[in-house]
């Protein structure tokens, strides 16, 4: 019997009581298949400074997986809130909730039926219900979103894209940037926001059998130029093409979520004094920066972590959330290439766990949508 099946049996009750909350939890770091388990627990009436919420949708982000593996810098507390037998953390950081009950302290801020998103990290979003400090919730207007997918993914990917375009370097209308991972959720949001702001872009994606279809999709969203990583590596052609594309303009910004050779190659086509912001490392390779780019082009390289940025600029980040909400409302932003995975909140624990594990292993962006 596999570890996770054993874990389900060990921490589950023998009969599931309708009305109990469920969560995906772990008490040690490691492979999600081996350490995750489903737990059922009671949620008491919320206290005066709490809001009782039920989860409508919980995205699965790469950082969530890294957190479970124990390799992510931000780590949740292990408590006995959902499992009395062993201190545990609830997985997930991003989530869309509906208010069910409101403690006295927040009755003027929240009301039953209202939508909100988690405003803090490490709260545990892969669950059906919780009591949460009202200060950790950000109310959102449900009418602003075409679907539940946009609202559920509001706080991470589009806000990261906004920060990368608006808070790394000063870009003016007509300026260029180059980005890898352009078909990632952040990349797609960056393309759409850049179109809105009037920025032009060179977008790098991995080659694939249906590459022309992908190129057309990204261009329809606002991408100026789309190339493959193989085309990027063709220096002779790139040295000819880039000047033709930018027509005397400047590539002031590089946006990198891949690192390795791809990011290093992108840097060669950035203008003097430009900045590359790295917010991911999907290649799991270091970034080999030629000394000449530092000395003769004065390029700047730094990391960007939206969690840290949010903690250092909480008021500004709240404004960004509402700006992004407006972008969804007016059609500037739309969510593409996402899959909603339905899960009944009263499903048995094995089904509950298996649904999350299958979503983790699958390809593309997955959002668990709880059916009430």
Curated annotation (Swiss-Prot):
NADP(+) binds at residues 157, 183-186, 206-208, 279-282, 304-306, 365. This is Enoyl-[acyl-carrier-protein] reductase, mitochondrial. It comes from the Eukaryota. GO terms for molecular function: enoyl-[acyl-carrier-protein] reductase (NADPH) activity; zinc ion binding. Pfam families: ADH_zinc_N. Gene3D superfamilies: Medium-chain alcohol dehydrogenases, catalytic domain, NAD(P)-binding Rossmann-like Domain. PANTHER family: ENOYL-[ACYL-CARRIER-PROTEIN] REDUCTASE, MITOCHONDRIAL. Belongs to the zinc-containing alcohol dehydrogenase family. Quinone oxidoreductase subfamily. GO terms for biological process: fatty acid biosynthetic process; fatty acid metabolic process. It catalyses: a 2,3-saturated acyl-[ACP] + NADP(+) = a (2E)-enoyl-[ACP] + NADPH + H(+). Catalyzes the NADPH-dependent reduction of trans-2-enoyl thioesters in mitochondrial fatty acid synthesis (fatty acid synthesis type II). Fatty acid chain elongation in mitochondria uses acyl carrier protein (ACP) as an acyl group carrier, but the enzyme accepts both ACP and CoA thioesters as substrates in vitro. Required for respiration and the maintenance of the mitochondrial compartment. The active site is at 72 (proton donor). GO terms for cellular component: cytoplasm; mitochondrial matrix; mitochondrion. It is found in: Mitochondrion matrix. The keyword Transmembrane does not apply. Its main location: mitochondrion. InterPro entries: ADH-like_C (IPR013149), GroES-like_sf (IPR011032), Mito_Enoyl-ACP_Reductase (IPR051034), NAD(P)-bd_dom_sf (IPR036291), PKS_ER (IPR020843). It is an enzyme of class 1 (oxidoreductase). Its EC number is 1.3.1.104.
